[in-house]
Amino acid sequence: MQFMFPLPHMLRLKATVQPWEASVTGADQTRMVKRAEELGYDMIAVPEHFIIPRSHVDLSGPHYFHAAAAQGYIAGATSRIRINSCITILPLQHPIVTAKALSTIDWMSSGRITVTFAVGWLEEEFKLLGVPFHERGRMSDEYLAAIIELWTSESPSFEGKYVSFKDVAFEPKPFQKPHLPVWMGGDADAALKRAARFASGWMPFLTRPEDFPARIDFIKSQPAFRGGPFDVSYGVATSRVGEGHKVNRDP
């Protein structure tokens, strides 16, 4: 078992954070991540959104980081602890840019990066960034395959609907081999199938602890599951007020 440090002021959700967290500065966070490393914590994970419509601020809060940028900063401020995302919204950035950002951080940190990808849920955010919301699942499948091709092939080549490349060079490759660990976030069946195909870990959001065995069995029963160790994260401090979120269909 490993432990993830819940760094304050990574987001501001009224239902789940303490009011004092809004006063935590970047300098405070830097001291905290260093102390978390000294205390033996194993991982820090960074949430991500790019832009929040005013109509969603009461639900989602206004304060989020660009996950890869924050991961890079935390990696530079520490020497041992692993830095994950929770989550990186895969369809909202070009996969070549995402692959480059993560391989750069992994290479420079000597292999301390994990990424948790998910397809996203906030339709208005997709509209603001010009990304087709109802194609996000298909885009994510293609983007994942393209990113792994860039990370692992000496002569990367990919042909798809949303991204294509050939006759290209891509370095640095990730420090970790064959590539940095990829986890999948989400609770929908499509997310778990994606985890079986592409990932070595799963970060659920709504799954109840008593349902974990069945969901893990579902992942491992998929034809694309490659076997081997498979990590699962669970936020024991997660709280919910009222009905809360529901799992949406992942196209």
What kind of feature is each model-predicted range?
Residues M1-A77, K177-L180:
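N-terminal beta1-alpha1-beta2 module of alpha/beta enzyme domains
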